[in-house]
Amino acid sequence: VRKGVYKEKVVIPESKISISLIGEDGAILTNDDFASKKNCFGEEMSTSGSSTCYIYAPDFYAENITFENSAGRVGQAVACFVSGDRAYFKNCRFLGNQDTLYTYGKDSRQFYDHCYIEGTVDFIFGWSTALFKDCTIHSLGDGYVTAPSTDQGKKYGYVFIGCKLTGVVEAQKVYLSRP
């Protein structure tokens, strides 16, 4: 993916196995939809419907891509929705506010390697098993970083190894996860 800002919705369907998106520095996928925004039928888009990028396919790989939801502080606004199994993100950026990264697939295993993830509230959330290795996780304000919905009986949910948790100076109370 060439350097540039691409304002669009990207969908990687389940049938497209082993897709790779490798970006030049500065490759940004962005959109500004949000959960309470009305669609063409006058219905709210919902959290899932607000995403900039949807990844349903297994064995997806992304490198040097920025996934952004630029809606601002308007409630839930997903940058990347990941449902496919064995998704691997290397040196990617996930930018948003509330609900930035949706690790959706209950049986999905996801790996985030040297990624940057930012948001305000519950900005990493969902059901998947996800490993975050050497990532920077940046809070833009007070709130919870993660809101996992790990099924009881699953061995792992979210695992963080060698990650840095950072935040804006104004943030007074930031918690790793909801109780």
Per-segment meaning from a language model:
Residues R2-P179:
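Sequence-level preference for short, compositionally simple segments enriched
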